[in-house]
Amino acid sequence: MRITKIFKDYRLFEIFILGIVSGMPLVIIFSTLAVWLKESGIDIAVITTFAVARLSYSLKVFWSPLVDNFKIPFLSRWGHRKSWLILCSSLMALVLIAMSKENPEVSLTSFYFLTILLGFLSSTFDIAVDALRIDKFDQETQSIASATAVFGYRIGMLITGAGALYLAEITGNNWQLTFCVIAIIFVVATIFIITVNEKELVREKINIISITSWISTVINPFKDFFKREFAVTILLAVIFFKLGDAMLGAVASPFYIELGYTKGEIAIIAKLYGLIATLVGGFVGGIVMYRVGNFKGLIITGIAQSLTHFAFIWLNHQPPSFEALLIAITIENFAAAMGATALVGYIGNLCNKKYSATQYALLSSASSLCNNTVTIYAGKLVNMMGWDGFFLFTIILALPALFILMYLNTKVNV
């Protein structure tokens, strides 16, 4: 297929828009909500417990067969994948409207429930979007579709990251209005989803046999992985590799607010410019892995991403300035993206090609599940250690992974 014909394909526009919608809730849960809570006077130890809402992204593999096979009454006439997208998108709009009506200072329990529900709906939406993309495109155009979806996803993250912070800033900290605007975007998205074309496929009905088969598809890749020598040690390296970065990420936005940075400055530097630093770092990380190999690449990027946390200790002792935040964000995002790229490549090489998709999902889910669980306690550690002590602790957290990788380098050929 000619490249010009590919980019004239309307299906790519559909996937791009769905990618935007898919990326929007993630940043609300991971970052934007933390700024609102911090400005409302909520303690950092409480704010980081909202990380429990992220667990849905790690656990979604367990209910993805339901999204594949269960027909939603009434909505399924629009199309099987679309029915799940319509349901999740419309419910996310309602959740965001409900959040806009709440005051976190007086209704924190409601905020917990709504945030967890948003995470569940968002992760389920992701399952349906990925499935729809795979259904709509053949093998020749699948990579273009995936790249388009990722690009849309990044745009969605900017809308609810930089966009939401900037809107809250110019409206005088009117978070209620900000969340209402985001909810309206989801309403418009729901209407758009109805117009999306879906290729209907014959689907297997859920029964005892299919449930047993589903259990086997999850268990067998696990069994295959743990048959290998040093399997548990490898898994520990994967889990610890990004743990320090995950801990830092959980408190970054409240940290900027506490230092005296405005939401507009955070939007422009941490979110908008930070994305550029992340993309460049990811590209460099890929080159490093290609040049020096998996183990050496992981060790190099692992050391780099942990040492860059010293930039936050330095930032903690600087008066709020555009330049200081720019330097810290450049160093941290660049190195973190290098590490993330290296980890993705390493996990990919660990997978048995017979179970590549499932083992990759399970290994990455194990890493994110542990990280998201531990980050719940990040705020308590900040209160106990102070900011400098906490950032030093995140550097130390990288050491187990580095020592394990150095040990494995002499034992395992990956």
From Swiss-Prot:
InterPro entries the UniProt entry points to: AmpG_permease/AT-1 (IPR004752), MFS (IPR011701), MFS_dom (IPR020846), MFS_trans_sf (IPR036259)
Record GO cellular component, one term: plasma membrane
Subcellular location: Cell inner membrane
Top-level division of the source organism's lineage: Bacteria
UniProt GO molecular function: transmembrane transporter activity
Keyword Transmembrane carried by entry: yes
Membrane-crossing segments per the record: 15-35, 44-63, 84-104, 109-129, 150-170, 177-197, 230-250, 268-288, 295-315, 324-344, 360-379, 389-409
Major subcellular location class: membrane
Keyword field: Cell inner membrane, Cell membrane, Membrane, Transmembrane, Transmembrane helix, Transport
Listed PROSITE patterns: MFS
Pfam family, any one: MFS_1
Membrane topology summary: Multi-pass membrane protein
Similarity field: Belongs to the major facilitator superfamily.
Protein name stated in the entry: Putative transporter AmpG 4
Species, as recorded: Rickettsia conorii (strain ATCC VR-613 / Malish 7)
